[in-house]
Design a protein with these regions (language model features):
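Active-site-adjacent loop/helix surface patches within enzyme catalytic domains
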Residues: 1-103
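Basic/polar, cationic surfaces and motifs that engage anionic cell-wall
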Residues: 76-170, 181, 185-188
Length: 202
């Protein structure tokens, strides 16, 4: 997650306010400091209404990490090098401890694409995948760009949605608005340079 608030102080205050009904297990400050907010054995309220594969409401079986970032509403910024170094260290520890599969390293927008954009298109998913955290494709960007403007058939478009479902995205009862948000969620993770919600050959 990113915090999506104007300041780090406000984010910490909200995450420790019982009335807000939102929390996380770990908080990573802009300077890279890691704060344990909720012990791992306890459920934190970070995922909210969420779905991935066959799981619904992922609070009960996930570990939530919040990273300081103003987000799309208040001036979305690149994550600091110190934040990413701390995130890599923390995530590697959690992967080893709980034997977490790479395909289950997720962003908030993966599990709640209808209402969330975080961690967003500036989150370094490719860099993390190189460090064996999460997944990334192996197709050269140059080759992908060449086919971006080619016409795509309805059959191919429908197959793309089916493949998203196979990965883990929840694709039932999609209307035009939900479909747009779903595709944008995928693009924010795997094609960060162009997030337009359009299904194309790339």
């Amino acid at each position: 997650h990113y915090t999506g608030m104007r300041s780090e102080t406000k984010a910490l205050k909200r995450l420790t306010d019982d009335k807000a009904k939102v929390s996380c297990h770990y908080f990573i400050k802009r300077n890279g400091q890691i704060i344990l907010m909720v012990p791992e054995l306890y459920e934190a309220w970070h995922a909210g209404k969420s779905k991935w594969k066959k799981d619904i409401s992922l609070n009960k079986n996930s570990i939530g990490v919040e990273i300081t970032n103003k987000g799309h509403d208040f001036g979305y910024q690149s994550y600091s090098k110190k934040q990413i170094l701390s995130l890599i260290k923390l995530t590697k520890y959690l992967i080893k401890k709980y034997k977490i599969k790479s395909s289950n390293i997720l962003g908030h927008s993966d599990i709640a694409f209808e209402r969330k954009k975080d961690p967003g298109e500036k989150f370094p998913w490719k860099h993390l995948a190189i460090k064996n955290i999460g997944i990334w494709h192996k197709i050269e960007k140059r080759k992908l760009k060449k086919i971006r403007k080619l016409t795509i058939s309805d059959f191919e478009s429908n197959m793309f949605i089916k493949y998203l479902n196979k990965i883990g995205y929840f694709v039932k009862n999609l209307n035009i608005k939900k479909k747009l948000k779903l595709v944008k969620s995928f693009q924010r993770r795997f094609r960060q340079e162009l997030v337009n919600g359009k299904i194309d050959k790339e």
